Amino acid sequence: MSQNDLNKEKALVVFSGGQDSTTCLFYAKKHFKEVELVTFNYGQRHDKEIEVAKKIAKEQNLKHHILDMSLLSQLTPNALTQHELSIEDNDDGIPNTFVPARNLLFLSFAGALAYQIHAKHIITGVCETDFSGYPDCRDSFIKSMNVTLSLSMDKDFVIHTPLMWLDKAQTWALSDKLGVLDYIRHNTLTCYNGIIGDGCGECPACHLRARGLKHYLEHKGEE
């Protein structure tokens, strides 16, 4: 499908208010005629995530769907839904921030919503390059979900992953190319400890984000 064709289409962005999904929001605004957002409330570590997502959606004048997925917090204790747990890697190398089946469920419900609002395109900010040990962020999983969603609803869905092969520095570069680097830096919430913008500087998410920004700014203009 050509860019001219995409400009006539509708897209649904899986949106958390973090760096990656907000970059996807602006990517979608550039490439699609109509954009809506879906945020999942799954009892995440910080309610502030939902408030940040609402604020950004309002500022960008986009229709924002918030779906209750609180049942996820009942399935397994992990550091994204259980506030009292510290963030660390498990013995199998998968971080205890991993929520089993999260992206499987999120994309399933995003597909159901996309069906209802007549959106062919679903955009998610998952990324395999800065692989954090999450098996449901892999390209192979996304491709399988694309087929499954299309078959389950007899619709020709397209799942877009514009960040899949970008590292964090390249993700910052994309936001700069879209003209929103400063907006994303100061208004998004990536920090596991709930601090907006540059975050706490201590958690794994902040380290990854800060390292990527530093690398991008140091090498900006070299290519």
UniProtKB/Swiss-Prot annotation:
Protein name: 7-cyano-7-deazaguanine synthase
A GO BP annotation: queuosine biosynthetic process
Necessary cofactors: Zn(2+)
Pathway in which the depicted protein is active: Purine metabolism; 7-cyano-7-deazaguanine biosynthesis
Catalysed reactions, as listed in the record: 7-carboxy-7-deazaguanine + NH4(+) + ATP = 7-cyano-7-deazaguanine + ADP + phosphate + H2O + H(+)
Segments crossing the lipid bilayer: none
Described purpose of this protein according to its UniProt entry: Catalyzes the ATP-dependent conversion of 7-carboxy-7-deazaguanine (CDG) to 7-cyano-7-deazaguanine (preQ(0)).
Co-factor: note: Binds 1 zinc ion per subunit.
Subunit structure and binding partners: Homodimer.
Gene Ontology terms for molecular function: ATP binding; ligase activity, forming carbon-nitrogen bonds; zinc ion binding
